[in-house]
Regions:
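Short beta-strand segments at enzyme active-site cores
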Residues: 43-44, 94-97, 181-185
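Thiamine diphosphate
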Residues: 48-175
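Metallocofactor- and cofactor-centric catalytic cores in central/energy metabolism, strongly enriched
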Residues: 2-82, 105-112, 169, 195, ...
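Flexible, low-complexity linker and terminal segments
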Residues: 1-27, 157-230
Length: 230
């Protein structure tokens, strides 16, 4: 699959280590934050303004293979959301991205079945919000979908330090609360240019190069149906 836009030069920034200064675009900083957080798998369905998240991942194929990070493009938002099911029973940090409320609506079924049993590994949904000036005609927001499924929604300020901190903190919040997190990224946040001090990338303990030998133990309480839900 070819990228919509090439980040072949910029992906070198994803290798920056502790104390080095990152200078680049917002969506590239999100990818760096995912790697710094020890993400094990990333997926999504392309849609503005977060289409370039997958473009960055595809151009960074060599680094993703080195880190053991699984990257997958979904046939739609529902397929992308279903990927996060890996974090229900396994201590894997995963992230997926798609377009705003319309994409979240397509993923509603999968998200309900993700939020009800909860997650043990951090699960992050990156929602590209495009309401307001210079955006699409759709003015609805993803907050209502987050409320429907009792999921946290975080909204970073449009500067790289805030965005990176939000990604890292979102994974921690997801794990301690056993709840998927939605992070909304508006147009300005996706394309803003800025800088932040980088950290070392973290290789996930379970990855494509170090697979878990045995399946996770079956936990009946995580099945979202009676009598567990009584």
């Amino acid at each position: 699959m070819s990228a919509e836009r090439s980040f072949s030069k910029e992906v070198g920034l994803l290798r920056l280590g502790e104390g080095e200064e990152f200078h680049g675009e917002g969506i590239l900083a999100v990818t760096k934050a995912l790697l710094q957080s020890g993400v094990a798998y990333v997926g999504g369905y392309q849609g503005a303004p977060v289409s370039h998240l997958l473009d960055v991942l595809l151009d960074a194929e060599e680094l993703m293979n080195e880190m053991g990070v699984h990257v997958e493009t979904g046939a739609n938002e529902a397929a992308a959301a279903a990927m996060l099911g890996a974090s229900i029973n396994y201590p894997l940090r995963g992230a997926v991205g798609w377009k705003s409320i319309v994409g979240t609506n397509v993923a509603a079924d999968a998200l309900s079945n993700l939020a009800s049993p909860g997650v043990v590994g951090g699960a992050l949904i990156i929602s590209g919000e495009d309401y307001g000036e210079g955006a699409s005609i759709i003015q609805e927001r993803t907050l209502s979908m987050a409320m429907k499924s009792s999921m946290w929604l975080v909204d970073p300020r449009p500067n790289l330090s805030s965005i990176v901190d939000t990604v890292e903190n979102a994974f921690e919040l997801s794990e301690v609360s056993n709840t998927p997190i939605i992070m909304q990224l508006r147009i300005r946040a996706c394309h803003v240019q800025g800088r932040f001090i980088a950290k070392n990338n973290k290789r996930p303990l379970i990855n494509t190069r170090a697979r878990q030998k045995d399946p996770a133990p079956f936990e009946y309480a995580k099945l979202a149906h009676p009598p567990v839900t009584f």
